[in-house]
A protein has these predicted regions:
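A charged helix-plus-loop insertion that forms the helical arch/lid used to bind
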Residues: 131-133
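Active-site beta->alpha N-cap acidic-glycine motif
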Residues: 20-116, 123-128, 138, 142-202, ...
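Cleavable N-terminal signal peptides of Sec/SRP-targeted secreted and luminal proteins
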Residues: 2-19
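A conserved mid-domain beta-alpha-beta active-site/ligand-binding segment of alpha/beta enzyme cores
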Residues: 220-226
C-alpha cells in the first residue's frame, strides 16, 4: 500500500565545473548526453542499467538536529558493531547537525567512528517560510557558519562536511543551491517526493531539469552552465 505522505530523499549532486544560474530555466535531461560519473538524469532508472537482482538493498540512515547525551546513548546502541554491511564493515549514518543543544565532544566521537557529519543550519529559524525566502547572504551565513562551527568545536574537517539538509525540509530554491555549489557542498537532502516511491528516485545531478515533483516550494529550477 502506498501512503500519500510517504517520500524518498533525493540527493542532488553538484557538478564541480559548473555554477547554478538563478532564474535561467534548466534544459531537459537526456541520458545519452548526461552520463556518469559527472552527470545523471533524475528518474527511477538504475545507474549503469544494472538489474535489480545485481545490486544490494541500499538504506540511507540519517538523523536531523542536535546531538546530545540522550540521543547519543541510542546511537551507541544502534551502532554497536552488531549490524554489518555486506562487505563486513559496520553500518554508519549521516548526522545533519544544528547548533543549539549539541554536544560537540559527541559529534567528534561520531566523526571518529566514520559516521558522516553534515548539517542542518545554525539556527533552524522559525517560521519555516524564512528558509523559502532567505536572501543569498542569509543562506550563506547559515550554511557556512554551521560548517565552521563543526570545524572549530567538533574538530570535523570542513572538506568532510559535504551534505546539507534544510530545516523543516524547506528548500530555498535556486538561491540555496547556488550557495551550496559555490561553497563546495556535494549534495542536498531536503526534497521529498510523493510521485517517486515505488520504484524510488535515484540520486541525480542538477546539470539539467529535474523530473521530481516539488512538494515544498521553492524547488531549484535553474540550470548549471559551464
Amino acid at each position: 500500500m502506498r501512503y500519500a505522505a510517504s517520500f524518498t530523499l533525493a540527493l542532488s549532486l553538484f557538478s564541480h565545473a559548473q555554477s547554478l544560474v538563478r532564474g535561467n530555466p534548466a534544459k531537459p535531461c537526456y541520458p545519452g548526453i548526461c552520463k556518469l560519473p559527472d552527470c545523471f538524469c533524475s528518474g527511477t532508472e538504475i545507474p549503469g542499467n544494472l538489474s535489480v537482482s545485481s545490486i544490494p538493498q541500499i538504506v540511507f540512515v540519517s538523523f536531523d538536529a542536535f546531538v546530545s547525551s540522550a540521543p547519543f546513548f541510542f546511537y551507541e546502541t544502534l551502532f554497536d558493531g552488531s549490524l554489518k554491511n555486506p562487505n563486513g564493515c559496520n553500518i554508519s549514518a549521516t548526522f545533519f547537525v544544528s547548533l543549539e543543544y549539541t554536544n560537540y565532544c559527541e559529534v567528534q566521537d561520531l566523526y571518529s567512528q566514520r559516521h558522516e557529519i553534515g548539517h542542518n543550519s545554525i539556527s533552524c529559524l522559525l517560521p519555516s517560510s524564512w528558509w523559502a525566502n532567505a536572501t543569498q547572504e542569509g543562506q550563506r551565513e547559515e550554511i557556512l557558519g554551521m560548517r565552521d562551527i563543526l570545524r572549530k568545536w567538533g574538530n570535523v574537517k570542513a572538506e568532510d562536511v559535504k551534505g546539507y539538509r534544510a530545516p523543516y525540509i524547506q528548500v530555498g530554491g535556486n538561491m540555496e543551491f547556488k550557495v551550496l555549489k559555490d561553497e563546495g557542498f556535494l549534495y542536498e537532502s531536503s526534497m521529498p517526493t510523493q510521485k517517486f516511491t515505488d520504484p524510488p528516485l535515484w540520486p541525480y545531478t542538477l546539470d539539467y531539469r529535474s523530473s521530481q515533483d516539488c512538494q515544498i516550494p521553492p524547488c531549484p529550477n535553474g540550470m548549471c552552465e559551464s
